[in-house]
C-alpha cells in the first residue's frame, strides 16, 4: 500500500490540466478547459477540466472525478498504478508499506502482463547492445538503416537471440510465471508443455501504450528464407488490442498537438526515420488496416491527418475505400505520394529533413480530390465506369458530417468530373436521406422490446 504522505506529495505536484492534456486536446474556456470526450464519440466538446477544483467532468459518458480517476477510467489502471504513473511523471519516490512490497504476486493480472513485457523489452534491448550476437547482427542492421543511438534508446529497440529458449529460460529463472510468458505471446508452448521463444533471431520493435509502457512487440527477421514470415507480431491479449494502438503515438502525441497534424505511415522503420529527422508527429497503423478506434485516437490531438504512401499504385487504390471512415469521423485527410522506389523511410534518409518537408508541401492533395483524380484516370472514356466513379465520389462526400465542407467538395468535384453541380448535390441528398432513414429504422428496432 502506498503511504499517505507519498499520496499527498503526488497530488500536490500533479497539474490536472497538464496530465489530461497528454490524452485530450484541451482549449481554455473561461476558468476551465474543454475538449472532445476520450470516452465517447462526439463532435461537440463536452469534456471539461476544472483546474481550480482539480476535477474533470465528461458529460457524454457521465464520468468524472480526480486526475487519478481519469487515469483509472481511460487506461484501466488500478488505484496504485495510477498513483505510480503520476509519481514517475513528477519525479516523486514512492514509499510503500512492507506488506505491499512482500506481496508483489498479488498484483492484478493486467499489471503482471505489463511487468513481463517491460522485462522482455529490457532483455531484448540489452541483448542488442551488450551481446556479440546482438551487436554483430541486430545493431549492425539498425545502423545500416541509419538509426542513431538516441533513436535506438528512445524507442527501446532490441534483438532476440537466435536460440530456442534464450529469453524464456532467463525469464523463468528470474521468477516470471509461465502463464504470463505464454499469454503475452513472448513464449510459445510445445506439445510437451515446455516453452520456447517466439521471436528467435529477430530485431525487436517494442509497441508502447498511450502512457509509454511496453505492451507488445513486432519482430523482424533478417533471414532471406521466403518460408520465414518477415514480421511476427504479438497476439491479442488483455493489454494489447492492435486495433486500438498506433505505433509511435506515445512519442508523437505532443508534436501532433503542436503541429495540429498527424502523419500516418505504414511501417516501424518509416516512423523511426521520420521521427529521427525531427518530424515527430508521425505514427503507423502497424501493418493493420486503419480502424475507427485508431482514427479516434488521432482525433484526440488533431483534426488533420496526412497519409504518406509509397509509390505502390495497387496498394494505394486498395486502401482508398477504407479512408472514407476518416471523413466519417469528421477529420480532414490529405494524401502524399512518394516516387516509385521510395517510401517515407528511404526518402527522408536520401533527401534529409528539408527535402522531405518540401516534398510533402509540394505534393499534398486533399483525399477526395486525389481519389477523384485516380479513379477518373482508371475509368478513361468509358461512360459506365465514369458513372460508377461519380457515385463513389459522392458516397465519400456524403460521409463528411460538416455540410458546408461537403458543399465545397461537391463544387470542386463537379469541375473535375465535368458534371453539373446540381446533379451531384441531388445524388448527395438522396444518399443522406437513405442513410438517415436506415439509421432511424435501426434505432426503432433497438427500442422495440423482445
What is each of the regions a protein language model found here?
Residues 73-92, 202-221, 345-350, 354-358, ...:
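Structured, non-catalytic alpha/beta "coupling" segments that mediate domain-domain communication
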Amino acid at each position: 500500500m502506498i503511504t499517505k504522505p507519498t499520496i499527498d506529495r503526488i497530488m500536490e505536484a500533479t497539474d490536472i490540466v497538464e496530465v489530461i492534456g497528454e490524452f485530450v486536446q484541451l482549449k481554455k474556456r473561461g476558468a476551465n478547459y474543454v475538449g472532445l470526450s476520450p470516452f465517447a464519440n462526439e463532435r461537440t466538446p463536452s469534456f471539461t477540466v476544472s483546474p481550480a477544483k482539480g476535477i474533470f467532468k465528461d458529460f457524454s459518458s457521465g464520468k468524472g472525478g480526480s486526475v487519478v480517476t481519469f487515469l483509472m477510467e481511460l487506461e484501466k489502471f488500478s488505484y496504485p498504478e495510477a498513483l505510480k504513473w503520476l509519481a514517475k511523471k513528477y519525479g516523486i519516490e514512492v514509499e510503500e508499506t512492507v506488506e505491499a512490497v512482500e506481496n508483489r504476486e498479488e498484483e492484478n493480472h493486467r499489471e503482471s502482463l505489463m511487468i513481463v513485457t517491460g522485462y522482455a523489452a529490457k532483455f531484448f534491448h540489452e541483448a542488442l547492445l551488450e551481446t556479440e550476437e546482438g551487436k554483430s547482427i541486430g545493431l549492425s542492421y539498425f545502423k545500416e538503416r541509419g538509426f542513431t543511438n538516441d533513436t535506438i534508446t528512445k524507442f527501446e529497440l532490441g534483438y532476440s537471440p537466435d536460440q530456442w529458449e534464450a529469453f524464456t529460460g532467463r525469464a523463468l529463472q528470474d521468477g516470471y510465471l509461465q502463464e504470463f510468458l505464454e499469454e503475452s505471446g513472448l513464449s510459445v508452448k510445445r506439445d510437451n508443455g515446455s516453452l520456447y521463444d517466439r521471436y528467435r533471431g529477430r530485431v525487436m520493435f517494442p509497441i508502447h501504450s498511450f502512457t509509454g509502457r511496453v505492451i507488445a512487440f513486432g519482430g523482424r527477421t533478417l533471414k532471406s528464407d521466403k518460408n520465414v514470415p518477415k514480421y511476427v507480431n504479438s497476439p491479442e491479449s488483455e493489454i494489447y488490442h492492435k486495433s486500438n494502438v498506433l505505433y509511435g503515438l506515445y512519442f508523437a502525441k505532443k508534436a501532433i498537438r503542436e503541429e495540429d497534424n498527424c502523419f500516418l505511415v505504414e511501417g516501424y522503420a518509416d516512423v523511426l526515420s521520420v521521427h529521427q529527422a525531427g518530424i515527430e508527429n508521425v505514427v503507423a497503423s502497424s501493418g493493420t488496416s486503419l480502424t475507427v478506434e485508431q482514427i479516434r485516437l488521432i482525433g484526440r490531438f488533431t483534426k488533420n491527418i496526412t497519409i504518406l504512401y509509397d509509390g505502390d499504385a495497387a496498394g494505394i487504390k486498395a486502401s482508398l475505400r477504407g479512408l472514407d471512415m476518416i471523413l466519417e469521423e469528421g477529420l480532414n485527410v490529405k494524401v502524399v505520394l512518394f516516387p516509385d522506389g521510395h517510401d517515407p523511410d528511404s526518402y527522408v534518409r536520401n533527401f534529409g529533413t528539408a527535402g522531405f518537408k518540401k516534398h510533402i508541401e509540394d505534393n499534398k492533395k486533399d483525399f477526395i480530390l486525389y481519389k477523384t483524380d485516380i479513379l477518373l484516370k482508371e475509368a478513361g472514356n468509358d461512360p459506365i465506369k465514369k458513372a460508377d466513379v461519380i457515385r463513389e465520389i459522392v458516397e465519400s462526400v456524403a460521409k463528411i458530417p460538416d455540410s458546408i465542407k461537403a458543399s465545397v467538395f461537391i463544387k470542386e468535384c463537379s469541375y473535375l468530373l465535368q458534371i453539373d453541380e446540381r446533379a451531384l448535390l441531388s445524388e448527395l441528398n438522396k444518399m443522406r436521406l437513405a442513410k438517415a432513414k436506415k439509421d432511424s429504422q435501426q434505432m426503432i428496432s433497438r427500442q422495440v422490446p423482445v
